[in-house]
Amino acid sequence: METFLFTSESVNEGHPDKLCDQVSDAILDACLEQDPESKVACETCTKTNMVMVFGEITTKATVNYEKIVRDTCRGIGFTSPDVGLDADNCKVLVNIEQQSPDIAQGVHGHLTKKPEEIGAGDQGHMFGYATDETPELMPLTHVLATKLGAKLTEVRKNKTCPWLRPDGKTQVTVEYRNEGGAMVPIRVHTVLISTQHDETVTNEQIAQDLKEHVIKPVIPAQYLDDQTIFHLNPSGRFVIGGPHGDAGLTGRKIIIDTYGGWGAHGGGAFSGKDPTKVDRSGAYIVRQAAKSVVASGLARRCLVQVSYAIGVAEPLSVFVDTFKTGKIPDKDILALIKENFDFRPGMIAINLDLKRGGNFRYQKTAALGHLGRDDPDFTWETVKILKPKA
C-alpha cells in the first residue's frame, strides 16, 4: 500500500501574529455592531511593549480603539511584561484614516448601490475546500493541529497547567493513502508542540503535561501507535514569547486560517476586513460551496475557486475540481454550484449575515481557524444540500 506524509501547523491566540488578527477583528466587530455598513480595513502590528493599529475605516460607529486593543490583549492573557506584553501599560498607537473616496465610489457608490450591484472591494481569487476525512469536512492534519492549540489555551486558562504562557505553536504530520483521489488518514506520524512557559517548570514536566493534558484528550487513540514521534518543546526553553519574542502582524497566518496547506490559497488575508472585501467574503462562500458538494455526497473531495475585479459585482470565473472523486461530472457540479450560490459580494453579505458584528463574532474567527468550526456565527459552515437534476 503506497502512503505519503502531509503536515499542517497551527499557532495559539498568544502568538504575536494571531494577537494582531484578533485586535483587527475586535475593531471590525465594534464598528459593525454599531454600523453594519462600516467599511473596515484594519491592520495591527506589535513588538515589545507596543501595539499599533492602522488602516482605513469609514463608519458612523464611535469606537475607542485603544480600549479595544487593551481589552483584547488582556483577554488573551498578556497581563505583564514577563509573559510578553502588559495590556494595561503598553504603548498603543492609532493611525486610522477614511476609506479612499475612489474605492468608495467604485465599490458601493458611497453607499448608494443596491446589494446586488455592490462591486468587489478589490480584485483577487479565493479558494474553498472540503474533504470527507473528518466530520468537519476538513483535513485531519489541520483539525488536529488546531485542536491541540485550542487545548493548550484551555489548560492554560483553567490552570490545569499553570506554567503555560500565551504563546505557542503546534504541528501534526499524518500518514495518508490516496483512495481514488480521496484522502484516507492512516495514523499520526509526528506531533510537535512548542509552547511558551514560565521559568519554574522543567522540560520533563512540560513533556509529561503536554502528553497527558493536551495530546491524549485531542488525538484519537486509533491514530497513535508506538511509532508516533513526539517533539515537545524541542528547542529546549521558551520563556520569552508573545510580542517580546517576535514582532506580530495581521494577515501572516493565512494557511492556519484556512486548510493547513491543503486545497489552495489566493493569498488574501481575512482579519480586519468588512464583507465588501472579497478576500474574506469570497473565501467564506466558496468554503460553503465546497462543503455542500461533499456533504451532499456529490464528491469525497472538492476545491472551488472564484475570482473578482474591483468594482464589478459578478465574479469573473468559478472553477471546480473534485480530484476524480465526483459522483457526477465536474461540469455538472459547477452548474449546481452556480444555481445555488450567489457570488456577488453584496449578496454574500446578506446570505451569510456578514454585516453582523459584535459579541466576538469576528474576533472568534481570528484564532483557531475560520473554517470547519461548529458555531452558529460561522454561517458559511451551513450546508446546502445539492441535488443533481434527474
From Swiss-Prot:
According to its UniProt record, in which tissues is this protein expressed? Mostly expressed in roots, and, to a lower extent, in hypocotyls and cotyledons.
Positions with a binding annotation for Mg(2+): 9
Q: Which cofactor does it need?
A: Mn(2+); Mg(2+); Co(2+); K(+)
Q: How is its activity regulated?
A: Inhibited by products of SAMS reaction (SAM, Pi, PPi), substrate analogs (cycloleucine and ethionine), and alternative nucleotides (GTP, CTP and ADP). Strongly repressed by PPPi.
PROSITE patterns per UniProt: ADOMET_SYNTHASE_1 (PS00376), ADOMET_SYNTHASE_2 (PS00377)
Relay the cofactor remark from the entry: Binds 2 divalent ions per subunit. The metal ions interact primarily with the substrate. Can utilize magnesium, manganese or cobalt (in vitro).
Protein name stated in the entry? S-adenosylmethionine synthase 3
Q: Which organism is it from?
A: Catharanthus roseus (Madagascar periwinkle)
Q: What is the lineage of its organism?
A: Eukaryota, Viridiplantae, Streptophyta, Embryophyta, Tracheophyta
Gene (UniProt):
SAMS3
